[in-house]
Structure formats: structure tokens, C-alpha cells
């Protein structure tokens, strides 16, 4: 990524060497011995992170302020299920999490089989719930942040137009080929 994304000043490139790891092959599972962030405490959170991170530009909490960040999602505004959580100022975490002290209703994903890679199904589903409640305009609370997290403005526009995940992904194919 350092070369491909142009991270070095003056369009410099660095010479990179891939060193094969003995006894490991692509596809082998691996569990990090140390959590990469207080908000990514386990393999489940790490696996769900790509799909849940874009919620940070919306009215939906990703569970910051709980002991299960990026494993629970919800909002005080909707009641998708009886599952609820209450973000609080926990030691070693954000002192002011979204919806601090309020019950959020949504999904417990702690034992859910996470999608392989990035999925828009959760974002699309929650957006549709807000739209059904007549609150579509309240869903993207930080639209520029959402756009930055997903890489462009087009995805947000496609979601608000009612496109399916498959239709949105199809638009990426040309760029991937």
C-alpha cells in the first residue's frame, strides 16, 4: 500500500520484499496475540470491523462504551429486536461514547458468523429501517466521514437511492479489473 497509495513524498517508491513464512499458507486462520486497539478486543470485532466501521458516520452506535465494541450495533431510535446495550464511560475507553447512558436497541453480533471481507448489508438494512420510520434524513449524521470511511460519495448516494449490495458492488467491478 505504501507504494500504491503514494504515501511517500515526491512520488518516491520503496523496494519491498515479500518474505514467505514457513509453515503458513494463505487462508490459514490466525489470531492476533495482542488486541490492535481497545476497540478491537478480539477476532470477532476485527472480522466485523470492515463492515461496521462505516456506521461511525451514521446515527447507529457500534458499541463504543461497552466491552463489545464492533460486535454490537444499535440506536435508541429504533427497536429492531429486544437486544439492547448501554454505552458508558469505561476505563481505558472513550469517555464520551455515542449515546452515553442511553439504551441502544439493535443487533448482538458477538457470536454471529461474520461476512468474509466487507459487506454493506448491515448499513443498507439500518438505512432502510430509518427510511421506513420517516427518518432517512437523520441516518447519515456525518456524511463526509461516512464517505471517507467507504472511500467515496457514490456509495452513500447509492444507498439512499435504494440500491442493493449487489448493485453497488457491480459498480466497483470496472475499477477492480
Where are these regions (language model features)?
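Internal gly/pro-rich beta-alpha loop/helix module
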Residues: 1-3
